[in-house]
């Protein structure tokens, strides 16, 4: 069985957001065994798997990414869409825009402390579209 659907994440402020529940609420029943791929159709945000318990991790991740890719650098040429746009593209490349997660016994087979992060790198990115592909039996 292969299923593919598009889902929408509601607009979020800049930062790292735990969205496991928001994604799962929009999905059909998962197969007993398989894989799920989640792909973000945008160039200034990303997806990641990281700790789901302590919200300080999300704050620290934002701090780290901002230090790795600062805004307002004179060497940036792509500046028409604002000071946060070119850094957002670079951060998206660093985090990636796709996740593949195993499905076991009809559930995402992630570690106890793992959750799906949506990483918004723009000050305001709007709603974001994800393509979800479920392969399983």
Each PLM stretch: what is its role?
Residues 1-137:
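Active-site histidine-anchored catalytic micro-motif
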